Amino acid sequence: PNEGVAMAALLRAALCAAGVALSLYSLHVKHEAERSPSYRAACDLAPSVSCTRVFSSRWGRGLGLVEPVLGKESALNVPNGAFGVIFYLLQGLLGTSGSRVASVTLLGTSVASAVASLWLGAVLLFGLRDLCVLCLSSYGLNLALLGLNVRRWQRHRTDRKPP
């Protein structure tokens, strides 16, 4: 059992490191695209396979939901990559705690990230009609973290001992 927990911890660390890297790169792409309209990122493979186009769209900030509800100047209307950095750091840090509260928080934030991934995936497919390799990669990371967090939560539930 301890071997499985150690392996899950290593996997979590790798997933979170990859997530932070992808999120930081998405912030870089967005910043460069705002500075120079001719900027072309490494993830821009074709006109309909362009992460720059996705990150520069209205859905590239606040999941496309914050601005219509809270306004363009809202403190929550940040690039989606900023949410990603916070999410992956939180997952990595809380993952080092063995507490039940950490397990519940990890699961809750993972479910939220899965819902956000489904929303943004639908926007990609039906709204933008674009393929964003970086986005799809982060959705995969989110799904893997959700799987880890469900298993961890189940382990905490079965380890509970009656008083």
Tell what function each PLM region has.
Residues 2-163:
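Membrane-interfacial helix-loop segments of redox and metal-homeostasis proteins
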